[in-house]
């Protein structure tokens, strides 16, 4: 919505040419990100923003196409292509492209025939032939060479994602590696080769399996299908259908790539530590060759029928094991429209987790279990959504009426006149904080490019929002919410529509560990100006002080913006008082003798400040953050709440009911089940998830006893942590004033949660009805951590199981197609008195469980050795440490972490110093000593009736535990 009077132009677009080696750019005057926008001669867009916080650069390469452009007969294609972009080019990923290509062509033709077959026996035979030819082609395939290239330049966060409108390739690189990065990416986008096809297809299908248990995704897909019945947003999903995934077309993939992966449909987005002109010179050198001899033709996108208005409200449903809820959605204009600004503000007015209409009228008054409102922007159309979860005995229709009731309050203007200004201030606060992140900046660039938004409109967003009035919002709400909606009820039950597909017979492809392309060697041997590491010096980077009552203070100055974080750290947690966590949750529903709970939340929101209470295993944090100028008022509010919280017995009974319902809902979630099962396996019955007040204890305890735990908390000795604008003396004076007269006592001692040793092989099995298993193999021999081993363990984890170039990723995913996600690590503790342990992790299809166990045990008992991979792992860790900067509140966190480990220095300093001496033999010997041929606890969450229990029993005795046992309620 473009409101009159809102577009007071604060910035001026600079459209004059600025020459730097003939590169013309545009920028917006007053843009806080100082983004420059360039365009190469082939139409490739480049967005650059300098941020010298760390010597690293966040890079996106965004292609303006996604799943909405998938051919209707091969949905999931855009996402699958994203995966294949990691398989290499004509220059890397292959030992000999000339010899390899005929077999790749043969595989392509065979898949075209295979996808048309319907007879099961014929399909099985054809797949066996594809598998056989793939074995021959794999002789020339060098798996994961892209990941080796990224490791060699010290890249971090190697990834990609596909959505409806965009496919984006992500890297975080050292600032001295732009030339190598650009060289690799330019080759990748110009010379992509489809190889490793059938094993990667299985990885995609494993990703699909994970989604089958994600009821939220299922619900959202249904919402889209009803809101956009004749647009790809609603007619097809990004992951694709089972049938299409099992019947792919390489021909269609190549045609899609040729049509959409062109320079004038692509943008490079970079934010970090660099020189604009130098980066543009490099990008021009490598990317200007892309389609250089072809005329720039506008990309022709499919045209879709115009959406007709919904004639009636639509109600539909989906079913799944997770907790029931309702999702409602209204159609909105495209994300690049000014209407998006207004809907983001409307969402914050309704739900901002503090003082929105839904927060105060529904959640605070415990009229439902919880919910929210949000805007989802797409390039063609968007969605305004509301969601709600019922409390015990409440129907989804009841929740729907509550949500619609808040829409009516919005339309009638039934909200405080202070709410909109508070929303605007908090949105500005969030925006300014986001600018600290390179990734947030590249997100903004990508969204602007994909949605066709002018950069001037992006930078002026806050000024447009600043001018909005309550009257305009109310008028808009009456127009917008006059349209019909779609409501999707998420019912709880078994989804009988999910079809099980048997695993294909895949012959593991060779890894060719010692092979490397000339291209990789060139990049590895390229000379770059090294970046010297900078380690935290706790004597220089951190200031220490004491309050008047001798509470230690750790202080770091904020020289960047007007924000602060103040945290009171108490040296005990749930291990000393299991009431604390429930007390902290209950506190959010209470006021004081002077202010109601609603008034407190409104006041915090008006101050653009927030507070939280985190109860950990061995420490508790009371944290306040927000605008530094309002810190004294925010601290006073928190102190008053903790000291003078007013018990509300009626609210407590409702709180107990909601808590029990929330607990039951969490027992229906697969990932929560696995997290809880893993804790049960590693720690036994006494662990952080079970050491809570039972349902019966919640019902019988006096609410005043809960609040007494928090009132006592404020009197325990603690450490003050501050990152902000004020100088140390002013911070101490503020705290002294607030805590004057308080008599502090020593904190209580807790009983530690203890990691259990593994004395023999055993299996812990818990039930969850899904098409896949979650599994951990855990070994603990009570080895104690020493700083001298840190470098060795760091290299081992990088080499064995911590990256896409690791042994685990290659063996489990690349060669066998057993999983979408697989990893392993030797876990070091956060405290010196806690042992180290070894752990593997995988999510896989039920009928692949034994294959996964056998594969893991094989590489654990005989660790594969490859000097090339080891050298790259060491190089990656070296460059990552050299370009990592610990800043801001992170300095305080690093100090506390070091103190818990019993050292007084930055551990990265020792790792960096010891790295050069680590050899492949060292990590092989380490693995043999700590992991190979050792007893393991196999922690498995899965549907027993679909698992090979007889094969499992041959590995170790099985201990079955119920859902109630692992949760403790």
Predicted feature residues:
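M16 family metallopeptidases and their MPP-like homologs
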Residues: 49, 54-67, 76-78, 94-187, ...
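Short, conserved charged micro-motifs
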Residues: 178-180, 276-280, 338, 394-398, ...
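Sec-dependent N-terminal signal peptides
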Residues: 5-14
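N-terminal secretory signal peptides that target proteins for export/translocation
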Residues: 1-2
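Active-site His/Glu-centered metal-binding helix of metallohydrolases
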Residues: 77-85, 583, 796
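Proteolytic maturation boundary segments
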Residues: 18-48, 275-319, 324-325, 329, ...
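A common structural junction motif
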Residues: 187-194, 287-294, 404-415, 640-649, ...
